[in-house]
Amino acid sequence: MSNHRLPLKTAKDPIGHKFSWLPQFLVNLVTRSGSISLNRDDCRTPMQWGPSINAGFCSDEVEPWLPTSPGHKSLNVRSEQNDQNSLLNCYKSLLLLRKKTPALHSGSLSITDNSNLSKSILSYRRIHNEQAVQIWLNFSGKQIHTKEIEGNPRVLFSTIPETTPIKSHGLLLQPYQGVVLGVST
């Protein structure tokens, strides 16, 4: 779901009221920097359940406390449920994997030495009893090749399921891709 920028002058948030005297161009400048938010209402808009007038958050006859995001007609839970590649289904798949994979929520965690790789890569290994997983996250907009993965890796989850990240020489991570590998201990 997307955040909806709301002018400080219409803020319901008490913190936002403290800054309502600021000119809108200054608010936009501060908000764009990403370092601070003057209006917490931006991320408190009603959940977008469907394409109806109030996004399915409340009946059409009721006015919600905050306005719905203008994009709610196309970006909502109902439309994401039907899209296998949606962020909603990505999270559901990750939660299911976490539920059935003890190493993802218990045991030890060790950060992989990536000193010879891009600073945009984060990798860590989780081990619980005899189960081990290796997580690789590419935070860059570029394809990145990694070193060879030890432990007979197999893909348990990928944010880009149509790709095969395991190559003979290591991993080939697509831009902004995350991969969970099952590996032997």
Predicted regions and their residues:
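Beta-strand-rich binding/interaction modules
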Residues: 143-161
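Short helix/strand-capping connector loops at secondary-structure junctions
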Residues: 71-73, 159-162
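A short acidic, often aromatic-flanked loop/helix-cap motif at beta-alpha or helix-coil junctions
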Residues: 54-55, 161-164
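C-terminal beta-strand-rich structural cap/linker in extracellular carbohydrate-active enzymes
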Residues: 167-185
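Loop/helix patches that line or flank the sugar-binding groove of alpha-linked glycan CAZymes
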Residues: 1-133, 139-145
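A conserved amphipathic helix/loop scaffold
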Residues: 137, 164-165
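Flexible, charged surface loops at secondary-structure boundaries
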Residues: 127-129, 149-150, 174
